[in-house]
Regions:
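Transmembrane-helix bundle segments that line or gate the permeation/cavity pathway
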Residues: 1-91, 108
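Long, contiguous internal "core" modules enriched in hydrophobic/ aromatic residues
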Residues: 55-175
């Protein structure tokens, strides 16, 4: 059922590059101390806090930004390559592009599971560096999946209602 909804999913992820740039700007402003989003970026706080000091190898401003750029670059590059292969498949007589995209997506899933967990530690859990959870990344991932399926369904229902997805039926949307 998903090929009919590929363009919907690709459209939804179209925000990734501008959204990623926005996130990087916020994180750079945090590192420059132009906001106080992450308390562990304040040297005075770190000096008097044993827990934050113990995490200073991981909670390092430069390493933090490098990780953020790594996560977002990987996600944006995957989105770009996957979309390019998807469009190429539309104009192809064989399924080589589909097979490439399938293999790429399987590899990306592993990359995403790891980087999404680390992203949740970096951007959410480190707001309060005294709190930690080994399961938090999985909770965030589960929330992302539910949000993604809901968003795909709502946008697909809307697009079908205005005539853009005539081949989509209740079987595709599990209604």
């Amino acid at each position: 059922w998903s090929p009919l909804l590929f363009r919907v999913m690709e459209g939804i992820t179209g925000y990734l590059l501008p959204g990623g740039i926005f996130v990087i700007v916020i994180l750079v402003l945090s590192v420059m101390h132009l906001n106080h989003l992450f308390i562990w970026m304040d040297p005075e706080v770190v000096e008097h806090d044993k827990i934050i000091k113990a995490k200073s190898g991981y909670l390092d401003s430069t390493f933090f930004l490098i990780r953020a750029v790594f996560y977002l670059s990987g996600w944006v590059i995957y989105r770009y390559v996957s979309r390019r292969l998807s469009i190429a498949q539309d104009n192809s007589k064989d399924n080589k592009n589909h097979v490439k995209n399938f293999k790429l997506s399987a590899a990306f899933l592993v990359f995403f599971l790891v980087t999404e967990s680390m992203m949740s530690w970096d951007w959410i859990m480190s707001i309060d560096p005294h709190w930690f959870s080994t399961l938090f990344g999985w909770y965030v991932f589960a929330s992302m999946v539910v949000s993604a399926v809901t968003t795909i369904a709502l946008i697909s229902i809307y697009l079908k209602s205005i005539g853009y997805l005539p081949n989509v039926n209740s079987n595709h949307l599990h209604l």
